[in-house]
Amino acid sequence: PQGIDPHIVTGVPEHHILISLCEGLTIPNLNSGENLPGAAESWTVSDDGKEYIFSLNKNAKWSNGDPVTASDFVWSWMRILTASLGSQYPDMLYYLEGAEEYHTGVTSNFDEVGVKAIDTFTLKVNLKNPTPFFIGMLSHYSTWPVHKNSVLKHGAIDDRNGQWTRPGNFVCNGPFQLKSWELNNKIVVEKNPNYWDYEKVSLNEMHFYPVSNVMTEDRMFR
């Protein structure tokens, strides 16, 4: 994979790995297409369709035991909108008030962007216009949170090559956590004991192999 920084990667292989490691505000039901609670246990939408209030799951934790908070999402969204990071998907958040202006340098004040932590577990999002598909967009990895202290311990907010994504450094909030990464060989993820829905995670480990040949891939399942 290119990497496992959800604000940097762009490929399908990376997505397959990241959905095991990270979790956004919502998660998709692949059978029905319904948007299910993820890091947010519930949400409300204003009558004009422009304000969203997310109540975060108070049992949601990072793999190191830290609680997943509204401020984590505010900082993470500021990160993807930081132009010097060079994310390929900042426009995923352009539906927010002031987001495009912040990303393009019209304003340097992130307080003007429509995302606020009302309290520890309440996130308010203000959109420029009603966007019925906004909730569905939140299942895209570019909107997922990253662990601020881990990122900054190993680099700056806009560091594309920070060591925070390496085994032993990577702190995530999904059902699995990073166990090992053998370059050009395999990535192993293991069940995250701090995941809020831990008991429903039926696998103890998953192994991801880089396979570019369809025939090779087919033989691996025989």
Stretch-by-stretch model annotation:
Residues 55, 74, 81, 85-153:
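Surface-exposed binding/hinge segments that line
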Residues 1-47, 171-172:
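N-terminal lobe/hinge region of extracytoplasmic solute-binding protein
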Residues 29-30, 110, 126-207, 213-215:
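Gly/Pro-rich hinge or "lid" segments in bacterial periplasmic/extracellular proteins
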Residues 1-2, 41, 51-54, 73-76, ...:
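Short, well-ordered beta-strand elements
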Residues 7-16, 71, 137-143:
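Short Gly/aromatic-enriched secondary-structure transition segments
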